[in-house]
C-alpha cells in the first residue's frame, strides 16, 4: 500500500508496536499463499475468520464444520482446503448464476436489524454481494465469531456506541495505553451514508458498470476505480467533462 512520506511517521506512531506499523497490505489472493508456513508453527495465531473475505473456500466446508467451528479454526488446520481467492460462487448462485449471499455474517447482521436479506431488490443485491466482505467487522467472544457491528446503524457514531456497549476494543495503544478500535474496511457503510447510496446507486454501478458485447449487456467484471471508465460510470448521471469530474474527485480526496 502506497504511503505518503509526510504521513508515514504519524502512521507508525498510531500503530506503534502493532503489525500494521510495519507490514504492507497484500492482495487477498497473495495472502493465501502463506498458509503453508502457518502449518509449520506450533500454534498458528490467525483464525479462518480473519481471512474469510479473501478466499472462496466454499459453503460446503463451513456447512460440514458448522459456522462456529469454521470461524474458530486455525489456518494451519485447514491446510490445502484454502487454495482459491474470491470466485464466482461468492456472489453468484452456481446453478442459476443469480446474485446471492454466501457469507453468514451479513445475513445475521440483517436479522439483528429485523430485516430479511432475501427480500433485497436486484439493485440492492448489486451492493450487498460486496457487503459480504467490504465492511467493518470484529471477532466476538472467545469463539472469535465474525460479526458486523450494525445493530445500531451504519454511522461511525452508531458503531462506536455498539462497541462501547459491548466493551470491545481491538488493542491497547502501547504509548497512550488507550483502548483502540481499528476499523477494517467499512466501504459499504460509508457508501450507504453517502449521497450515492442514499439515491440508490449501487457499488457495481460505479465499480462494475454495464457494457455490451455481441448484443449482450452485462456488468464489467474488471473491478476498478470509476475514474478508469468515466464515460460508463460518472457520466451516466453527471454531464460535466471527464477532466472536470476527475479533478473534482482528486480535490475532494486530497
Where are the model-predicted features located?
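Primarily the internal scaffold of c-type cytochrome electron-transfer domains
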Residues: 1-37, 56-85, 89-205, 209-254
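Long, hydrophobic/aromatic-enriched structural stretches that serve as scaffold segments
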Residues: 49-55
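Selective for proline/serine-rich intrinsically disordered segments
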Residues: 40-42
Amino acid at each position: 500500500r502506497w504511503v505518503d512520506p509526510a504521513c508515514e511517521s504519524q502512521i507508525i506512531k498510531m500503530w506503534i508496536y502493532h503489525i500494521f506499523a510495519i507490514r504492507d497490505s497484500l492482495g487477498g489472493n497473495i495472502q493465501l499463499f502463506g498458509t503453508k508456513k502457518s502449518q509449520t508453527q506450533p500454534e498458528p495465531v490467525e483464525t479462518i475468520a480473519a481471512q474469510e473475505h479473501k478466499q472462496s473456500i466454499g459453503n460446503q466446508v463451513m456447512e460440514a464444520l458448522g459456522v462456529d467451528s469454521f470461524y474458530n479454526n486455525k489456518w494451519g488446520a485447514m491446510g490445502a482446503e484454502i487454495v482459491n481467492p474470491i470466485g464466482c460462487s461468492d456472489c453468484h448462485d452456481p446453478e442459476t448464476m443469480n446474485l446471492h449471499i454466501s457469507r453468514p455474517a451479513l445475513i445475521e447482521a440483517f436479522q439483528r436489524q429485523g430485516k430479511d436479506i432475501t427480500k433485497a431488490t436486484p439493485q440492492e443485491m448489486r451492493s450487498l454481494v460486496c457487503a459480504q466482505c467490504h465492511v467493518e467487522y470484529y471477532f466476538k467472544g472467545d469463539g472469535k465469531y465474525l460479526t458486523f457491528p450494525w445493530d445500531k446503524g451504519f454511522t461511525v457514531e452508531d458503531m462506536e456506541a455498539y462497541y462501547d456497549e459491548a466493551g470491545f476494543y481491538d488493542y491497547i495503544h502501547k504509548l497512550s495505553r488507550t483502548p483502540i478500535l481499528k476499523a477494517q474496511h467499512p466501504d459499504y457503510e460509508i457508501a450507504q451514508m453517502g449521497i450515492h447510496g442514499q439515491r440508490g446507486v449501487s457499488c457495481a454501478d460505479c465499480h462494475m458498470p454495464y457494457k455490451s458485447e455481441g448484443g449482450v449487456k452485462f456488468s464489467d467484471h474488471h473491478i476498478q476505480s470509476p475514474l478508469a471508465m468515466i464515460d460508463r460510470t460518472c457520466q451516466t448521471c453527471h454531464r460535466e467533462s471527464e477532466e472536470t469530474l476527475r479533478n473534482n474527485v482528486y480535490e475532494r480526496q486530497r
